[in-house]
Amino acid sequence: SQIQGFLDIPVDNLAGNPIFVDYYAKKYGSECENMMVVSPDVGSVSRARAFAQKLHMNLAIVDKRRQKANSCEVMNVIGDVRDKDCILFDDMVDTGGSLCNAAKALIEVGGAKSVQACASHGVLSGPANERIANSCIKELTFLNTIPPLEGACSKIKYLDVSPIFADAIQRIYEENSMSCLLYTSDAADE
């Protein structure tokens, strides 16, 4: 959404998070009671909180300190994740270091029962695939906004965003409102 102001043409920021909400609601249904959404860092709290509210789950936070670009040291887990099935919710995964460290902290420091993760964009550069394969993350789900990684480990799954794009194209063509597909100030639909 930040790029919208820098272009000379109309740009619409389509919301992908409803795809994740639908996926987890269908996957777990009423079993969500023992689950918790986790923000992998303090900067992602508002996005993760909105996601947790949509799924009627509680929120925890992994407090970390970044030593340099593409590396971090996980410091603490804020919130009671003991014996909970956790969903780490992030915007993108590049090398996977932050995400895998957060998952490890949830298990080792917080006592979580299990960890899965989702992120809108799977960049997956460098050691990401190997890190994810060797991590305690049970499943990592992305939207297919970036072409899937060839040879991705079996933990990685992609959800299709084409229905949102198709709906947007149809709405533009028919000159209908786009508001239900766009980013709003409510981070739940980001």
What residues fall within each predicted segment?
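C-terminal functional extensions of proteins
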Residues: 156-179
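Beta-strand->loop->alpha-helix junctions that form or flank phosphate-binding loops
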Residues: 62-63, 162, 182
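Active-site-facing substrate-recognition patch
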Residues: 1-28
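A short acidic, often aromatic-flanked loop/helix-cap motif at beta-alpha or helix-coil junctions
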Residues: 17-21, 67-69, 148, 161-168
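Conserved small/polar residues in nucleotide/adenosyl-binding loops
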Residues: 183-188
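PRPP/pyrophosphate-binding module of the type I phosphoribosyltransferase fold
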Residues: 26-43, 47-154
